[in-house]
Amino acid sequence: RLNGNSIYDQPYGDRNEFPCPDRLGSCTMTDEDYRSTRKGQSLEVFDNLYEAKQHLNFKPQLPSGLEGLRSVHVSIVDHDVLQVVYAYHELLKGTYFDRVDDMPKYIKYRVSTLSGNIAGDYKDYLPQKTEVVNDIIVTYRMVDDFVYLASWEHGGQNHVFLFNEPVSVERAREMINSVGTN
């Protein structure tokens, strides 16, 4: 479980929450945008997904069946956005990491029945790409040819994946396909 000062404990739009990825030329956010995303937001942290689900008024669709994906932080933002931070590493064997090379990548997943931008990420991106994955329209925000953010709506729920290290479109597709009600 991450401590209370973690970036994962911050609600929407914290300037330090989503640093500009390498190789990204345009990454801006105005003070006005920043202030408007920070008004009166709450964040409630839970010990596990089961506990968090009891506090939602919907049954969230979540990623499952992906090798090496472990939830490390669970919270609800503004009472109706479930946020799960996953640690991911190809060689993840357990909870502890022996070498710096073994440090995981972090993936933030948010799901809600709210429409609109639930990512909390308001920077400008070039390029943006849209594709259809299993009859679902997915929008990617890209860094070079890699995905930094993927968002889509399905089954009355709004979904977002944010990757602290951009991933291939194929990997993003695999993760999107893993999301279902469980």
Explain the meaning of each model-derived region.
Residues 155-182:
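Surface-exposed amphipathic alpha-helical segments
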Residues 2-155:
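Short, solvent-exposed recognition patches
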